[in-house]
Amino acid sequence: MVKVYIAGPIPEVGLNLLKDQGFEVDMYEGTGIIDKETLKQGVKDADALISLLSTSVDKEVIDAANNLKIITNYGAGFNNVDIDYARQQNIDVTNTPKASTNSTAELTFALVLAVARRIPEGDKLCRTTGFDGWAPLFFRGREVSGKTIGIIGLGEIGSAVARRAKAFDMNILYTGPHQKVDKEREIGAKYVDLETLLKNADFVTINAAYNPSLHHQIDKAQFEMMKPTSYLINASRGPIVHEKALVQALKDKEIEGAALDVFEFEPEINDELKTLDNVVITPHIGNATFESRDMMSKIVANDTISKLNNDQPKFIVN
C-alpha cells in the first residue's frame, strides 16, 4: 500500500483527499515540532512526506527514506528542506504558493497599523492600570495615510501589501533583484535600491522569500540609514533581520518601532524584544486563517496525489 507520512497535524480537508485515494496515512500528533529521530522513522517506508514549515528535512532525513518520491512542504517557503539533495535523489519538492498571499498581506498591514497606532500598548494599558480619559497629548501614534511604505520583495505577497498600502493613500517604494514594470503600472510603485528605500520609507516591510544571500540583510548599517520616525515590519523570515542590531536600534531610537511575526531563532524570541513597548510581536501567524490553511492542505494533498499517481505535481520547486 502507498504510504504518506505527515510531520504534524494539518486541516482535515487535505487528510480526507489522501484517504479517499486509499493511501495509508500516518501523521505525527505529538506536541511541538517533530524531533529528527521520529521523523526519520516516519519516512523510512513512506512514498511521500508532507513536511511543515517547522520541519527540518535535511540530508540525514532524506537518506533515512527508502521509497520517498515527493516532499510536499506545507508552506510557501521551503528553506527548511534540502531541495538540492532531494533533487539528487530524484525526489520532487513542492510548496504552497499563493495560498498565503492574502492572509500574510493582511497580517503585514495589520502589523503596520498596530505598531503605528500603538494598539497592543493601548490594550495592555486598558487591562492593567487604566487611563484618565482623553487628553490632547495622550497616547499619540502615527498616521499611515500620506506616508511612504518601502517594500522589500515585490512578489505575490509584497504586491498584495502594496495594493493595501495604495488603499491607504501611501506612497510606495519597492526593492528586489528585478524591476517589475507591470507591477509599477498596476500599483503605482517606484523601484529603488535598498539604501534609497531605507532612507525614505516611513514603514519598511520585509516580504521577500528567504535565501542565504538575504541573511542579516537588515543589520546595524541599515538601521542607521532609516528615519528615526520609521518602523520595521517583518512577516517574512526572521534571519533576514539581525535581531541584536534591531534591539540596539530600538534602544538608541534609530527607529521608532518594529512589528515582527517571525524571529531570527524561532521559536525562541529575543528576551530584550519582549521588554520593549515599541515592539509588536505575534507568533508566526502570517497565514494562520481558516481559509489559507485549508487551501494549503488541499494543495499539499493534491500534489502528493499527483506524484503517487504518476502525474506531474503542480508546484515543484526543485
From Swiss-Prot:
Name the InterPro entries on file: D-2-hydroxyacid_DH, D-isomer_2_OHA_DH_cat_dom, D-isomer_DH_NAD-bd, NAD(P)-bd_dom_sf
Where does the chain cross the membrane?
Answer: none
Cited Gene3D superfamilies: NAD(P)-binding Rossmann-like Domain (3.40.50.720)
| This protein's record includes keyword Transferase | no
Binding site residues for NAD(+): 156-157, 235-237, 261, 284-287
Task: Report the EC code(s) recorded for this entry.
Answer: 1.1.1.-
Kindly list the GO molecular function terms attached to this UniProt entry: NAD binding; oxidoreductase activity, acting on the CH-OH group of donors, NAD or NADP as acceptor
The UniProt keywords, alphabetically, are: NAD, Oxidoreductase
Q: Which domain of life is it from?
A: Bacteria
* Catalytic residue positions: 237, 266, 284 (proton donor)
Q: Name the protein family.
A: Belongs to the D-isomer specific 2-hydroxyacid dehydrogenase family.
Q: Which PANTHER family does the protein's record reference? A: D-ISOMER SPECIFIC 2-HYDROXYACID DEHYDROGENASE FAMILY PROTEIN (AFU_ORTHOLOGUE AFUA_6G10090)
What is the protein name for this chain?
Putative 2-hydroxyacid dehydrogenase SSP0606
Which organism is this protein's natural source? Staphylococcus saprophyticus subsp. saprophyticus (strain ATCC 15305 / DSM 20229 / NCIMB 8711 / NCTC 7292 / S-41)
